[in-house]
Amino acid sequence: MFKFNEDEENLKCSFCGKDQDQVKKLVAGSGVYICNECIELCSEIVEKELAQTTSEEFTELPTPKEIMDHLNEYVIGQEKAKKSLAVAVYNHYKRIQQLGPNEDEVELQKSNIALIGPTGSGKTLLAQTLAKTLNVPFAIADATSLTEAGYVGDDVENILLRLIQAADFDIDKAEKGIIYVDEIDKIARKSENTSITRDVSGEGVQQALLKILEGTTASVPPQGGRKHPNQELIQIDTTNILFILGGAFDGIDEVIKRRLGEKVIGFASNEADKYDEEALLEQIRPEDLQSYGLIPEFIGRVPIVANLETLDVEALKNILTQPKNALVKQYTKMLELDNVELEFTEEALAAVSEKAIERKTGARGLRSIIEEALIDIMYDVPSSEDVTKVVITDKTINDEVDPELYDSEGNLLNDSKTSA
């Protein structure tokens, strides 16, 4: 039996050696004791280390080339856009590193980014991959769901809430995150003339977004929705949040063409027509975005514009097979878990790519096309003992013919008949 009372007066802190009567509290563990003073000291050490970790979050900031290399692992093509993004993001976080005790009289301003390109060209994927590369919180918002205050719809502060949620409500982390706002072209003013009527989802939303783009301390409802009196709000500084705005900007090539056409008056009036759409987008200027319907103040807060090209068949084929998370690799792995080999012929890959172009969905539509071709196979294969290999041909994609099924001896098990 323990004689606790007899030994109690001799108890000491195992760390500092002080007797129990020299400290306020002595906490017993398994054969050891720690006093309140040592607990406080440990707490201070841990807090300092955590603070140092936070302050050094971007000390290992990758160079533009390293950012580009990481983007290349997941995003095929779009070399100019990737290079522009790599430099812009590097400069943004280098600017954040510069802030603080060593800040001098030169103030480096934030440069938000606009990505202009057709649906399925990789705008969202680029933004997502950037956030993963830098290990920062990331949120996506759709500009079409936003309305100015006082109207039915989402307040712009709800965008910030998504970022805060992505950061697990760590405000310091959220304040260094990335927000991607898609469909930004859909909030363009309907004409260059200021309307006397209310433009609920146009200029008013641009004005609301302008505040968080340029940097402000925003009040965010923790549960989302509209603000209410007496509601507790989360305060977040948007100064160091990087905003990437994406949009297809359908028809902006005509705006650019008109501007270029004005410069060639006196020559052939159709001279501007020699530019194809992609070459025209490389000529984009702030005044073109203003003509399209973005207000000058908004354009001024997004100084970097990167153009994404329309993806052709070869680019889409590469997207299907080359990235680390390529769709063909994903579906191959899925069937591999059922001990079945999956193969796509070159003609099948071309057919998938051509169908995506035909549907005008770009890379975004590739998964649904493959899913359509494989749905029956993924349903039947887990309960089939004979099938060890599945071959997807162009006929599977174009004519809805069943994939070729083979057994372990290489024998064809079906006649590739048209699916019911």
UniProtKB/Swiss-Prot annotation:
Pfam families: AAA_2, ClpB_D2-small, zf-C4_ClpX. Keywords: ATP-binding, Chaperone, Metal-binding, Nucleotide-binding, Zinc. Belongs to the ClpX chaperone family. GO terms for cellular component: HslUV protease complex. The gene is clpX. GO terms for biological process: cell division; proteolysis involved in protein catabolic process. It comes from Staphylococcus haemolyticus (strain JCSC1435). InterPro entries: AAA+_ATPase, ATP-dep_Clp_protease_ClpX, ATPase_AAA_core, Clp_ATPase_C, Clp_protease_ATP-bd_su_ClpX, ClpX_bact, P-loop_NTPase, Znf_CppX_C4. SUPFAM superfamilies: Glucocorticoid receptor-like (DNA-binding domain) (SSF57716), P-loop containing nucleoside triphosphate hydrolases (SSF52540). This is ATP-dependent Clp protease ATP-binding subunit ClpX. Component of the ClpX-ClpP complex. Forms a hexameric ring that, in the presence of ATP, binds to fourteen ClpP subunits assembled into a disk-like structure with a central cavity, resembling the structure of eukaryotic proteasomes. Zn(2+) binds at residues 13, 16, 35, 38. ATP binds at residues 118-125. One of its GO terms (molecular function) is unfolded protein binding.
